[in-house]
């Protein structure tokens, strides 16, 4: 993914799950920063049963996981590293009753962000795109949910099993460039 982004001269924000942040992947994290990408927080566990037991947000668990993930970042990247951006696992829009958690995170200097477009790579297998063409159609169709938004935040994943996302990334970049968009990071 980073090689494609570099080839096209664009930057992205990478949301990391805290338990994966180790010295073994320090080179990847450092490369992301060196190449101008942003690194952000996506919880420690990504475990819905811990974060939202019974579909109810567990504020103390969420805040604790955000803080532990920050500690993991700092253990790898240095004590001066700080990210202010957090993406709720499953997305903020998927859960009710997050207002007090949002306020608690804000007191920690953390702001949540959601996406307003997606390529479909995290959807259930029955509707997940299986070709670059279907992924592009899915992406294009997702615009209808926030048609007035001038800023597009696209949900994509670069984990194992997401080869189609990597394969389609050049087309996705060109899609937005053709519409006059510029690329930036969330900070």
Task: Indicate where each model-derived feature is located.
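Alpha-helical scaffold elements lining the catalytic groove of polysaccharide deacetylases
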Residues: 46-78, 92-150, 164-167
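Active-site-proximal beta-strand/loop segments in catalytic clefts of secreted hydrolases
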Residues: 15-19, 42-45, 86-91, 115-120, ...
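Short, surface-exposed basic-aromatic patches at helix termini and helix-loop junctions that form
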Residues: 30-33, 102-107, 171-174
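Terminal accessory/targeting
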Residues: 2-13, 75, 148-187
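Active-site beta->alpha N-cap acidic-glycine motif
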Residues: 1-88, 175
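Structural motif
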Residues: 36, 83, 110, 149-153
């Amino acid at each position: 993914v980073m090689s494609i982004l570099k080839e096209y001269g664009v930057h992205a924000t990478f949301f990391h799950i805290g338990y994966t942040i180790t010295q073994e992947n320090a080179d990847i994290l450092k490369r992301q920063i060196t190449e101008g990408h942003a690194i952000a927080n996506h919880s420690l566990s990504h475990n819905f049963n811990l974060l939202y037991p019974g579909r109810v947000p567990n504020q103390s668990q969420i805040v604790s996981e955000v803080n532990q993930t920050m500690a993991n970042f700092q253990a790898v990247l240095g004590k001066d590293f700080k990210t202010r951006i957090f993406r709720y696992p499953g997305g903020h829009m998927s859960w009710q009753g997050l207002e007090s958690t949002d306020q608690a995170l804000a007191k920690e200097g953390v702001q949540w962000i959601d996406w307003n477009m997606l390529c479909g790579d995290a959807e259930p297998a029955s509707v997940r795109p299986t070709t670059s063409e279907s992924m592009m159609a899915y992406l294009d169709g997702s615009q209808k949910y926030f048609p007035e938004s001038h800023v597009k935040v696209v949900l994509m994943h670069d984990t194992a099993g997401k080869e189609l996302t990597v394969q389609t990334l050049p087309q996705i970049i060109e899609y937005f460039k053709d519409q006059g968009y510029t690329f930036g990071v969330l900070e």
